[in-house]
Amino acid sequence: MILSLSHFLIVAAMLFTIGVAGIILNRKNIIVVLMSVELILLSVNINLVSFSSFFGDLTGQVFSLFVLTVAAAEAAIGLAILVAYYRNRGSIAVEDINMMKG
């Protein structure tokens, strides 16, 4: 069985929907929100690579590597901020983060 472009787009659309649902349904835990954002970025990367492969151009695949690099840096910085915030406040609830000064 040969996988066509529509197969990849369906998988990417499902991952995107799961990521958006994770953000909408779970707004209390910031770690779940960060994981949902990463899932959305993964679905965008799947779209970039699948369209790039379908049209025979390497630009989308190279751009996907840059997006993965930025996503990894974003996740590392976000988790470092959360660890520092948890050490100061003792909670990582989204409601508590809104009360920060600065």
Curated annotation (Swiss-Prot):
Sequence intervals crossing the membrane: 5-25, 30-50, 62-82
Pfam families cross-referenced by the UniProt entry: Oxidored_q2
Catalytic function, reaction form: a quinone + NADH + 5 H(+)(in) = a quinol + NAD(+) + 4 H(+)(out)
InterPro entries the record matches: NADH_UbQ_OxRdtase_chain4L/K, NUOK/Mnh_C1-like
GO-annotated cellular components: NADH dehydrogenase complex; plasma membrane
Gene Ontology terms describing biological process: ATP synthesis coupled electron transport
Topology in the lipid bilayer: Multi-pass membrane protein
Top-level lineage group: Bacteria
Keywords annotated in UniProt: Cell inner membrane, Cell membrane, Membrane, NAD, Quinone, Translocase, Transmembrane, Transmembrane helix, Transport, Ubiquinone
Chief location bin: membrane
Annotated localization: Cell inner membrane
A molecular function (GO) term: NADH:ubiquinone reductase (non-electrogenic) activity
Family, similarity comment: Belongs to the complex I subunit 4L family.
Subunit-level organization: NDH-1 is composed of 14 different subunits. Subunits NuoA, H, J, K, L, M, N constitute the membrane sector of the complex.
Annotated function: NDH-1 shuttles electrons from NADH, via FMN and iron-sulfur (Fe-S) centers, to quinones in the respiratory chain. The immediate electron acceptor for the enzyme in this species is believed to be ubiquinone. Couples the redox reaction to proton translocation (for every two electrons transferred, four hydrogen ions are translocated across the cytoplasmic membrane), and thus conserves the redox energy in a proton gradient.
This protein's name: NADH-quinone oxidoreductase subunit K
Organism: Methylocella silvestris (strain DSM 15510 / CIP 108128 / LMG 27833 / NCIMB 13906 / BL2)
Gene behind the chain: nuoK
